[in-house]
Curated annotation (Swiss-Prot):
The protein's name: Elongation factor Tu
Compartments where found: Cytoplasm
Annotated region (G3), positions in chain: 83-86
GO molecular function: GTP binding; GTPase activity; translation elongation factor activity
Subunit structure: Monomer.
HAMAP family in the record: EF_Tu_B
Amino acid sequence: MAKAKFERTKPHVNIGTIGHVDHGKTTTTAAITKVLADAYPELNEAFAFDAIDKAPEEKERGITINISHVEYQTEKRHYAHVDAPGHADYIKNMITGAAQMDGAILVVAATDGPMPQTREHVLLARQVGVPYILVALNKCDMVDDEEIIELVEMEIRELLAEQDYDEEAPIIHISALKALEGDEKWTQSIIDLMQACDDSIPDPERETDKPFLMPIEDIFTITGRGTVVTGRVERGSLKVNEDVEIIGIREKATTTTVTGIEMFRKLLDYTEAGDNCGLLLRGVKREDVERGQVVVKPGAYTPHTEFEGSVYVLSKDEGGRHTPFFDNYRPQFYFRTTDVTGVVKLPEGTEMVMPGDNVDMSVTLIQPVAMDEGLRFAIREGSRTVGAGRVTKIIK
């Protein structure tokens, strides 16, 4: 009896390959799919190098990113794996979050050791909150000298420690190319790599386990019943008759009770992350709430006006600005469902930011927004998206 393709029963983990150009990220990805397809044919299919390397273009908030998605399973887990072939694609993906990672495989060629992009990728992974990194030391078939490998390992551990990653993380010696060719020793190295992923990348916290949060998209008045707010539940779950807080955009929060939950015209007892639903609010007038606010579990989230963010600025070709911007630039920041104007402060020594750059900036919003680290936003001028970023630090 053939097993079903996608089993919900296994933990689902998002993973990706990162590292310097030509160190073998895509070859490693291809090798993982081949070796697992051979080991567990009923669970996996192999993806050829060319299929992964010719990454399809994706549009994420108007930004073009070349990125490949493959999936595979070990006995323990179901993995969704992203591979961004180009350095620029990797940076755009990390900042815009086209693919969120629960853990990353840092691919380093034993022949070169850590290179500038290796460092940059690890730094960026830290900034955007990738929780765990382990290492695939690739091309080990080309290095005979054990001492060289030891030196490279020391360098990698220093690099991980610099960015507060686990310096005791597994470093697995592999040859992705030899594994693709079917060499027994190196095929085993890929099995070891996946075992290390299973053992060392922590199970991600599921969105449903976090406190309730639903951004308001629309507001209706139902005569005789009250006000209904609709949106997609981003986190957590909520039962009828629980209290909620409505925060953001306005100075003061509103506290109320949810007296009804509706989805697809049916009344529900409860709703959870991923559902599109309407919440009937007790004693709330239509003018008390607005789009852009969020409905949350009381006390679980706070609105903020000042933050630091990591931002990718769209190039002219991507429909972005044609000219640079400077300190005190005042665009709109689009969070979840609404735009809020903000003032940009550039880092010390940065005179201006050119289209196509990535930059860290601090922002002061004119209205508070419920946020925590990792929240994504778009930067807009009117209806045109000119940048994308994520919150790296809350200031106030």
